[in-house]
């Protein structure tokens, strides 16, 4: 996440957003919140990304410019921490540091080139001929982590399916273990994916919320409608999405208005969402992910390979069996 002022200057990034927000928790007047910009880098050649659903970039800024701004601040934070920890050793050896950036498995050459261009613009590299940057796919990095930490006891010829459920997309790919020491893998299925990441939950919730707000029958541009929408979206992002368990619970959101709109589920200052409404946000997304997983398993089984399985999530939501 980045926050830009009206002069296209970054006034907030990642966790450092105090100067960008008003006391209400929303961006100050004239400040634009920019998110999901990583998806902009992978638009070229990736048809399952819908540009219509992506937030607009700041005027005069390209997707590479915005990604470079974020990487610049990430690099500055990293340098500050390393200087505190290593002191003169870091200053002396900084020019020799190699960098590794992870990218989704389904990214094409255009997406990788855009990532590298953003890294150069952010100051990670001196120029295009600097070879200290390596791009590694996120699933491959996950497989290496599983091996090095002992999470999976991977043997030569084992297949491991990596399902990377990210913010914008879900990416899947299966690897076969070629060597245990040093650990190396090779693709054994073609990468697949879809735009069914966490932001798809937000889009589904937004559609349900807008339908409820329309039942309030307020005039276009109503500040009350805008206030209800903003508070519900924030509560879904910060609370409901993480805590949903499909256990019949109702969710009450403090929308901060005195008027009651029972037809929209607003009573005593709270808008209520049923378990079924929140389930509608999750079910199509989770079912699509399961479909992608099944297709990958079928491809692996067709090659008579042994698939290693591990659960690395604490999420308790259980989708329907359909």
Locations of regions flagged by a protein language model:
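Gly/Thr-rich phosphate-binding beta-strand-loop-beta motif of the actin/hexokinase/Hsp70
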Residues: 32, 148-187, 205
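Gly/charged contiguous loops adjacent to phosphate- or pyrophosphate-bearing nucleotide/cofactor binding elements
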Residues: 41, 91, 104-106, 196-322
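Short acidic-glycine loop/turn motifs at beta-strand connectors
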Residues: 1-9, 176-182, 257, 261-263
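Short secondary-structure boundary/capping segments
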Residues: 115-122, 150-152, 176-180, 189, ...
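Short hinge/gating elements
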Residues: 50-59, 186-191, 219-220, 276
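Early-domain small/polar-rich strand-loop-helix modules and first-structured segments
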Residues: 1-51, 134, 184-199, 203-206, ...
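Glycine-rich phosphate-binding/hydrolytic loop that grips phosphoryl groups
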Residues: 1, 134-150, 202-207, 284-287
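Nucleotide/phosphate-binding catalytic cleft detector across ATP-hydrolyzing
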Residues: 31-162, 226-227, 242-247
